[in-house]
C-alpha cells in the first residue's frame, strides 16, 4: 500500500490523461470543480473557449450564447463578497486598470451551468474545448474512485493490525488464566486477583467488540461516501416530417459518445431526405430511471403502434421532460449534499433514534407455541390531541359543500379502527375544533 494518498496532479500525470496541467487556464477550470463553487468567466477563459477580440466583445458574444440557450448566469463587480478569495478574481483585479476596475463586470455561472455552456459552444475549436473539459471532469471522477479504494485498503490494513493486537492481548490473557489456575492449585491466589483478571477479560472483550464495530462502520462509510454522478443523457429526437405531426422519440444513453450510434440506427430506417436529428439533450444520473419516470407521467401520449414515439406538441413535451429530469437531478444532488452528514452520523457513537409508534387501537397477534395457536392482545398508547385534530381536518374535507352535519358516533367509530383514544376527551377536542372553523358552520350530532 502507498505511504500517502497521491494528489490529483500526480495522479493525472501517472495515468497519462490528456490534460495540460501547466496551461494558464487549467487552474480556472480546476478550482470550481474541486471547490464546488461558481466559475468566473475571465479573459483567459474566454480566449480558451475560442472568443477573439477585446474583452467587451468576447463577453458580449458569450452572453449571447447563454441567452440563446436559456442558461442562467449572473454579472458581478470586483468587490463581490462571494469571490474576494477566488484566485481567478484576484488575478483579474491585478490585470485590470485601476481606473476601469469599478465599471468592469464579470459573468459568473454555477458549475452545472458552466458545463452546459461548454457543451453548447459554437466557436471554431468548440469540439477540442468540450473534449478537454470532459477529460478533466472524468479525471476528477476517476480520482474520487481512487480515493475511495485507497481509504478502503487503509481501513482493511488498520483492521488487520488491530486484530493482531487484540489476539496478542487474548494470548496474554490465556497465559494469565493458566498462571491463575496454577496459583489456585497451590492455594495462594486471592479473590481480589480473580476479580481483577475477570474485569480485565471483560474490558478486552468490550474493546474488541467496540473496535470491530468501528472498523465495520468505517469500511461501510468508505463504500457509501462516493457521490452519484450526473453524466448520462435523456434526448428528444425527431425528423421534419415527424415533428410536423407532433411525433417525437424520447430516449436515453449512458454518455454523449453513444449519441452518434443512436442516430445511425434511426437514420438507417428513415426515408431519404427526412433524416432524424437530436433537438434537445438533458443530463441525468441514470437515463433508464429517467425514462421510467417519463413513461409513468406521460405514457398515455405514446403512439399505440410505435411505443417509442410520444405524440405531443414540442413546446409542451419539452416543458414536461425538463420538469421531470430537473426534479430527478435535484433529488440526486440533494442526496449528494447530504452524504457527509449521513456518514458522520454513522461514525458517531451516539445512541440511535428509535421513533415512536403511532398510537392505534388494540390488535391481536397469533403465535405458534408448542404446536398451538396463542393469541396475544396488544394495546397501543393513546392518540394525542394533535393527531385527532389532524383527522378531524381530513374528515371535514371529505364533506360536500352542502353537508354540514357531523355525527359524533360515526366519526369516533371510524377513528377507533386506527387509534386508541378516550371518547370524552375527543368530544371536547371536536367541539373546540368545530368552533374554530370560520369558513363554514357545522352542526354536531351526538348520535
Curated annotation (Swiss-Prot):
InterPro entries xrefs: MSV199_dom, Phage_T5_Orf172_DNA-bd
Sections of the chain in a coiled coil: 188-221
| Full protein name | Putative MSV199 domain-containing protein 420R
Superkingdom, according to UniProt? Viruses
The protein's matches in Pfam families, at most eight in alphabetical order, are given as:
MSV199 (PF10553), T5orf172 (PF10544)
Record key words, sorted: Coiled coil
